Amino acid sequence: MGQSHSKGNSGPGDSLQSYPSFSRSDTKESLRSLRGSIRSKIRSSDSPRGSTAGLSDDKSDAASVKSTTSRRSSTNQSVQSPDDTPSQPDAPEPPPSPSLSSSLKRGHKDVNAMQQSGEVDHVSDVPPTGAAPTGPSTQKVGESILIKRENQLNPILDFIMNAPLETSGSPGMGMGALKSIDLDDMISRLLDAGYSTKVTKTVCLKNAEIMAICSAARELFLSQPALLELSAPVKIVGDVHGQYTDLIRLFEMCGFPPASNYLFLGDYVDRGKQSLETILLLLCYKLKYPENFFLLRGNHECANVTRVYGFYDECKRRCNIKIWKTFIDTFNCLPIAATVAGKIFCVHGGLSPSLSHMDDIRGIARPTDVPDYGLLNDLLWSDPADMEEDWEPNERGVSYCFGKKVIMNFLQRHDFDLVCRAHMVVEDGYEFYQDRILVTVFSAPNYCGEFDNWGAIMSVSGELLCSFELLKPLDSTALKNHIKKGRKERNSMLSSPVSPPLLRFVVAKEDHNLFVQHRRDACGLFLAYPSLVTSWGISR
């Protein structure tokens, strides 16, 4: 895990706010304590506990649930922070995540060389066509990929389920009133905001609408298990970190929902300039397509982390602190991990010494904050590493690093073929770990305007062939030009006169936000050769 910066070509105007560059000093507070490394960067008067204390007397706030066991227990209820929080410096330090891969030292791979070696089958500015062995998908658009099981373990804290969901006193915007037509309008406004290329002082949605979205999403997350079991095909997305225009580029390249099924691995907020639009669009798509669009929890979907690294400040500046608190309540309900076709284990961070059975994940009671230690902490924070030992303290200052033997034993024990995770900046957007037993996917290109990294999305076909689609790193000027072109195409499609039958089709597409999937300034990279599929054993 190297620490060198990429050869970024962007100017200082591209970097986020005033956050400095990454350094190892961010993570040397303690060995495995999440709050140990976070608290030193938070003023006592601005701690998440202090920020929410005066907002409401509602005791259902999941972020304030006290732990009933010891700190080293693997339970996943939160442990309250002490009151004597150390002072925070005026300029917040960068987050202890994502870590930087050693690929950032080596530079981008030579795509031509990769093609000659057989690793890359297709590189183009348009989708793979003709003989590309993707295989036809038998799944219909909008068909559920969520595998449901009777009497599935899914513990929910009773006092949370019995508590009324807060809607900011707006009777017309309760969860029952959040209808499909409301979601369509909200999605349209959010996309309009993205295509405008402007970061506005306020959000395009009203506070009452944001509260309603969060309340509905909260209940939906709790209705689905903490360990999602999904079928293929699906596109797996890594860290996004508030890079809203890049998220729109991602949907342009891979297909707006429900044309494609999606599984996001977490880290939707912090660092980027438009975390609010990013998480709101994702939540709206989750509500619109609940069994085709899935969001896992990342280590940044946490009160303490968002308080330090940007999202709290953005909510306070553009909405209010109560909106931030509502998002935290929603984050505390997110699912933790997922499996794809019973062969690919997906999680934000990595593995845990506390994980012996998949029921350990299913048994995580929600809503829950991220505890100091234990299973949930490790799943969101741990990293793979080239080392002889099975486990060792993570240099982030939180959780562990794990070696090849741990991964191999995990795959064999649970009959998986691949671990797919995010949580780490990698130069080419994706990076395999030894013998392709684990892959890191990072989907925020030109991360923070500081790294010249690509963004990647891993596509898993119905036949379990794995491919990667890449988002080219663009500086702020190139990104604006790209979005303007996309806006023109979108407006042209929406305003073009069509015959009645085609009009009905276009209306249906607009209803599902299926706009033209152009891949300008993006690269489709396809990995599908027999030896790869055979070595993974990813087959029916």
UniProtKB/Swiss-Prot annotation:
<feature type="binding site">
    <location>
        <position position="423"/>
    </location>
    <ligand>
        <name>Mn(2+) 2</name>
    </ligand>
</feature>
<keyword id="KW-0963">Cytoplasm</keyword>
<dbReference type="InterPro" id="IPR006186">
    <property type="entry name" value="Ser/Thr-sp_prot-phosphatase"/>
</dbReference>
<dbReference type="GO" id="GO:0000324">
    <property type="term" value="C:fungal-type vacuole"/>
</dbReference>
<feature type="domain" description="Phosphatase tensin-type">
    <location>
        <begin position="258"/>
        <end position="540"/>
    </location>
</feature>
<dbReference type="InterPro" id="IPR050341">
    <property type="entry name" value="PP1_catalytic_subunit"/>
</dbReference>
<keyword id="KW-0464">Manganese</keyword>
<dbReference type="InterPro" id="IPR029052">
    <property type="entry name" value="Metallo-depent_PP-like"/>
</dbReference>
<feature type="region of interest" description="Disordered">
    <location>
        <begin position="1"/>
        <end position="108"/>
    </location>
</feature>
<dbReference type="GO" id="GO:0046872">
    <property type="term" value="F:metal ion binding"/>
</dbReference>
<feature type="active site" description="Proton donor">
    <location>
        <position position="300"/>
    </location>
</feature>
<feature type="binding site">
    <location>
        <position position="299"/>
    </location>
    <ligand>
        <name>Mn(2+) 2</name>
    </ligand>
</feature>
<dbReference type="Pfam" id="PF00149">
    <property type="entry name" value="Metallophos"/>
</dbReference>
<dbReference type="InterPro" id="IPR011159">
    <property type="entry name" value="PPPtase_PPZ/Ppq1"/>
</dbReference>
<feature type="compositionally biased region" description="Polar residues">
    <location>
        <begin position="15"/>
        <end position="24"/>
    </location>
</feature>
<dbReference type="GO" id="GO:0005634">
    <property type="term" value="C:nucleus"/>
</dbReference>
<comment type="subunit">
    <text>Interacts with at least 54 proteins, of which 31 are detected only after iron starvation and 22 are detected only in control conditions. Only the regulatory subunit of the protein phosphatase PP1 (Afu1g04800/AFUB_005140) interacts with ppzA in both conditions.</text>
</comment>
<feature type="compositionally biased region" description="Low complexity">
    <location>
        <begin position="62"/>
        <end position="88"/>
    </location>
</feature>
<feature type="compositionally biased region" description="Polar residues">
    <location>
        <begin position="45"/>
        <end position="54"/>
    </location>
</feature>
<feature type="binding site">
    <location>
        <position position="239"/>
    </location>
    <ligand>
        <name>Mn(2+) 1</name>
    </ligand>
</feature>
<feature type="binding site">
    <location>
        <position position="241"/>
    </location>
    <ligand>
        <name>Mn(2+) 1</name>
    </ligand>
</feature>
<dbReference type="Pfam" id="PF16891">
    <property type="entry name" value="STPPase_N"/>
</dbReference>
<keyword id="KW-0378">Hydrolase</keyword>
<feature type="region of interest" description="Disordered">
    <location>
        <begin position="120"/>
        <end position="140"/>
    </location>
</feature>
<keyword id="KW-0479">Metal-binding</keyword>
<feature type="binding site">
    <location>
        <position position="348"/>
    </location>
    <ligand>
        <name>Mn(2+) 2</name>
    </ligand>
</feature>
<dbReference type="GO" id="GO:0004722">
    <property type="term" value="F:protein serine/threonine phosphatase activity"/>
</dbReference>
<feature type="binding site">
    <location>
        <position position="267"/>
    </location>
    <ligand>
        <name>Mn(2+) 2</name>
    </ligand>
</feature>
<dbReference type="InterPro" id="IPR031675">
    <property type="entry name" value="STPPase_N"/>
</dbReference>
<comment type="similarity">
    <text>Belongs to the PPP phosphatase family. PP-Z subfamily.</text>
</comment>
<feature type="binding site">
    <location>
        <position position="267"/>
    </location>
    <ligand>
        <name>Mn(2+) 1</name>
    </ligand>
</feature>
<dbReference type="InterPro" id="IPR004843">
    <property type="entry name" value="Calcineurin-like_PHP_ApaH"/>
</dbReference>
<feature type="compositionally biased region" description="Low complexity">
    <location>
        <begin position="127"/>
        <end position="136"/>
    </location>
</feature>
<protein>
    <recommendedName>
        <fullName>Serine/threonine-protein phosphatase ppzA</fullName>
        <ecNumber>3.1.3.16</ecNumber>
    </recommendedName>
</protein>
<keyword id="KW-0904">Protein phosphatase</keyword>
<feature type="compositionally biased region" description="Pro residues">
    <location>
        <begin position="89"/>
        <end position="98"/>
    </location>
</feature>
<comment type="function">
    <text>Catalytic subunit of protein phosphatase Z (PPZ) involved in iron assimilation. Regulates secondary metabolites production, including gliotoxin, pyripyropene A, fumagillin, fumiquinazoline A, triacetyl-fusarinine C, and helvolic acid. Plays a key role in pathogenicity.</text>
</comment>
